[in-house]
Design a protein with these regions (language model features):
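Conserved HGGG/HGGXW glycine-rich cap/lid loop of the alpha/beta-hydrolase fold
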Residues: 45-91
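Conserved catalytic-core motifs of eukaryotic protein kinase domains, centered on the activation segment
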Residues: 67-69, 92-98, 160-163
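Gly/Ala-rich beta-loop-alpha elbow adjacent to hydrolase catalytic centers
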Residues: 127, 131, 135
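Short, hydrophobic alpha-helix immediately C-terminal to the catalytic nucleophile
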Residues: 69, 108, 136-140
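Alpha/beta-hydrolase fold catalytic core
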Residues: 1-55, 76-79, 116-119
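Structural signature of beta-strand start/N-cap positions in the alpha/beta core
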Residues: 54, 80, 122-124, 147-148
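Flexible "cap/lid" loop of the alpha/beta hydrolase fold
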Residues: 136-140, 148-181
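Active-site loop/oxyanion-hole signature of alpha/beta-hydrolase fold enzymes
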Residues: 35-38, 43-45, 83-126
Length: 188
């Protein structure tokens, strides 16, 4: 059955699997990490078993914490879960500069806050695309804060990579589509 895209999310997910519908019904707590460079927004789901584990989901470029809403609740039996809006994305505030270190320092600050205010002992970062780069930074520069990382669809540069020698592809025009159906058909 083809999924029909409308202007009503409830109709759009009518044929979604039960686990998906159940997951998006669970409403996380919205949290803010105050930071002089710009506040960081994140969603938090508490474990159903008072777990000492914390999983932090970090999105990719141009995404936001809500992308993890159907996924995060799948881990609540054994973990507390956080989904972060990186600086300048989602509901987090904009900053004057952005970089992997800046993003990683935000994640480290959230971990420190959660460890201070809860029983969290084991921390796992799951990063998609850019989020994987951020997870890698935290793993290499802030090892004492985390236990493991999982990176998904993340490029890893070789140790001898020289950005001055990198040649990117041509820039493409941003495409505009008249409606959701046209967008969906683009990917069929």
């Amino acid at each position: 059955m083809l999924m029909q895209i409308t202007n009503n999310v409830n109709l759009d997910i009518e044929h979604a699997p039960k686990w998906f519908k159940d997951a998006i019904k669970l409403q996380p707590t919205d949290e803010v990490l105050e930071n002089p460079l710009g506040n960081i927004s994140y969603s938090k789901w508490d474990s159903i078993n008072n777990s000492e584990n914390l999983m932090i989901f970090v999105h990719g470029t141009g995404a936001h914490k809500k992308w993890w809403d159907p996924i995060a609740p799948q881990f609540l039996e054994n973990s507390n879960v956080i989904a972060v809006d990186l600086p300048g994305m989602g509901e987090s505030e904009f900053r004057d500069k952005y970089g992997i270190k800046d993003f990683g320092d935000c994640i480290a600050s959230i971990i420190e806050k959660e460890k201070l205010n809860s029983n969290v002992k084991n921390v796992y970062i799951i990063g998609h695309s850019l989020g994987g780069q951020v997870a890698g930074y935290v793993a290499s520069e802030k090892q004492d804060l985390i236990d493991n990382i999982i990176i998904i669809d993340t490029f890893i540069r070789p140790p001898n990579y020289n950005p001055a020698e990198h040649q990117g592809g041509p820039l493409r025009m941003i495409k505009h589509y008249p409606d959701k159906i046209t967008i969906l058909n683009r990917f069929r």
